[in-house]
Amino acid sequence: KEYLSKALQSLSQAAIVHTTLGPSGGYRLARAPDAVTFLDIVEAVEGKASTFVCNNIRANNPCRPGDYCETKPCAIARIMWEADEAWRAKLRSVRLSDLIVTLAAEIPANIWQSSFEWVLKRA
């Protein structure tokens, strides 16, 4: 619950959801589903920092030439940064509206209905 609460607070601060306080309060989307990407959500909750942080451990190699590690990032760092950007590009290309279409096709109507009723009982 604590993680979910913090995530929803972050989504509210990023203007992805609106918060309503009080006994009948809750959260709702602040934007249309086609205006929210998965990257918007991830960056709101986790931040915009790269998923890979290079510690330049090769600089600890006692056999390296003096400025060898300062000329360019190592191959591992470059690959990881490229992978991070590919991940972000994919998340940027998928919107909440895409998820709605996918779930509507994959989840039977009776499960949607029972889930909806379950939520209503607890609202």
Predicted feature residues:
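Canonical helix-turn-helix DNA-binding module
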Residues: 1-18
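Beta-hairpin "wing" of winged helix-turn-helix
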Residues: 15-30
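Charged, amphipathic alpha-helical coiled-coil/dimerization segments
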Residues: 26-46
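C-terminal regulatory/oligomerization modules of transcriptional regulators
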Residues: 37, 50, 54-123
